[in-house]
C-alpha cells in the first residue's frame, strides 16, 4: 500500500514544501498574494503556499507547510492554527483517478468531487476567518539558505526531513488500514461510513457508484479520517501548534462536502 500509492504520491511534495519554505518562497509569495489571502481569510500572503501545496499534494502536505511557515516566523500561532483548519486537503489524483475513474467509471465525476473538495475547503477557511485579524505585515529578516548553502545541500536537508515525515505517515496509514478492516465486514451502509471516518484507502473498494457513494466519497475525503488527523499530529509535533482547529476544520469540511454532494449528485451522476 505505502510503496505503491502513499510514498510516490506524498514524498516528493513533503520534500518540495520544506525546500520552498526554506528557500524563501513564503516571503516571495506574500506581497503578490496578500490581496487574496488577507481579505478572504485574514491571513498573510505567505499562507497561500500552504493552501496551494495542500490542494496539490494531498494529506498532510498543507499541514506540513503551515508548520514550516510557523517555525520560520512567517505566521503567528493563531494564524497558523486557523490555516490548519482548511489548508490540509486530499490529493486531486486520488479524487479524480482513483475515485472518479476507478470507482464511478467517470473522470467527470472525479473532477466534480475535486471541485466540491476545493469549495468546501475555501468555505471552511471563510468560516474560520472571523476568529482572526491580519494587518500589514513586516516579515522577519532572515538569511535565505540558498545564499549560504548550495541548492544541492538545501535539497539534501529537505529530503532527510521528508523521509522522517514519510515514515510517520506510512506508519499511521498501515495502522489504520488494519484497524479499518474489521469495520468493513459490518456490511450495509454502516460499514463503509465507519471505514471512511477511519481511513480513506480502505474505503475505496467499499464505495458504491451511486448517489450514496458519491455523497460518502465527498464527505469522507473532506473529513480525511482519523488516520489523517494522526498524520497531521505527527508533522506538527514539536512545532507548538495545536491540532484542535484542524480537527474542527476537517469536521466542518466533511459536513460541507456532504451537503454539496447531496445537492449536486442528481446532476453530476445524471
Where are these regions (language model features)?
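Transmembrane helical segments that form the transport core of multi-pass membrane transport proteins
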Residues: 23, 155, 159-225
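Interfacial loop-to-transmembrane junctions
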Residues: 235-255
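Intrinsically disordered, low-complexity non-transmembrane regions of multi-pass membrane transporters
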Residues: 132-160
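Alpha-helical membrane segments and immediately flanking helix-loop junctions
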Residues: 40-104, 194-208, 212-239
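Juxtamembrane boundary at the C-terminal end of a transmembrane helix
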Residues: 260-270
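Membrane helical hairpin/interfacial module
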Residues: 4-9, 13-65
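Alpha-helical transmembrane segments of multipass membrane proteins
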Residues: 120-124, 128, 176, 180, ...
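Alpha-helical transmembrane segments
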Residues: 6-10, 109-125
Amino acid at each position: 500500500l505505502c510503496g505503491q500509492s502513499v510514498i510516490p504520491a506524498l514524498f516528493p511534495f513533503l520534500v518540495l514544501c520544506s525546500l520552498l519554505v526554506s528557500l524563501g518562497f513564503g516571503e516571495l509569495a506574500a506581497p503578490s498574494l496578500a490581496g487574496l489571502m488577507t481579505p478572504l481569510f485574514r491571513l498573510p500572503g505567505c499562507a497561500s503556499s500552504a493552501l496551494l501545496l495542500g490542494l496539490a499534494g494531498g494529506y498532510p502536505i498543507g499541514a506540513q507547510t503551515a508548520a514550516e511557515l510557523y517555525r520560520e516566523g512567517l505566521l503567528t500561532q493563531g494564524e497558523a492554527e486557523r490555516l490548519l483548519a482548511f489548508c490540509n486537503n486530499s490529493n486531486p489524483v486520488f479524487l479524480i483517478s482513483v475515485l472518479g475513474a476507478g470507482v464511478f467509471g467517470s473522470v467527470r465525476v472525479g473532477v466534480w468531487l475535486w471541485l466540491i473538495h476545493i469549495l468546501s475547503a475555501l468555505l471552511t477557511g471563510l468560516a474560520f476567518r472571523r476568529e482572526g485579524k491580519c494587518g500589514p505585515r513586516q516579515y522577519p529578516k532572515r538569511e535565505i539558505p540558498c545564499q549560504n548553502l548550495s541548492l544541492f545541500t538545501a535539497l539534501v536537508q529537505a529530503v532527510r526531513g521528508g523521509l522522517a515525515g514519510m515514515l510517520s505517515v506510512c506508519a499511521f496509514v498501515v495502522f489504520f488500514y488494519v484497524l479499518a478492516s474489521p469495520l468493513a465486514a459490518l456490511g450495509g451502509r454502516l460499514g463503509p461510513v465507519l471505514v471512511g471516518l477511519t481511513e480513506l484507502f480502505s474505503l475505496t473498494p467499499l464505495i458504491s457508484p451511486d448517489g450514496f457513494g458519491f455523497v460518502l466519497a465527498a464527505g469522507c475525503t473532506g473529513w480525511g479520517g482519523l488516520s489523517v488527523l494522526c498524520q497531521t499530529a505527527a508533522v506538527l509535533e514539536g512545532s507548538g501548534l495545536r491540532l484542535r482547529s484542524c480537527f474542527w476544520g476537517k469536521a466542518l469540511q466533511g459536513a460541507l462536502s456532504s451537503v454539496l454532494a447531496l445537492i449536486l449528485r442528481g446532476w453530476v451522476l445524471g
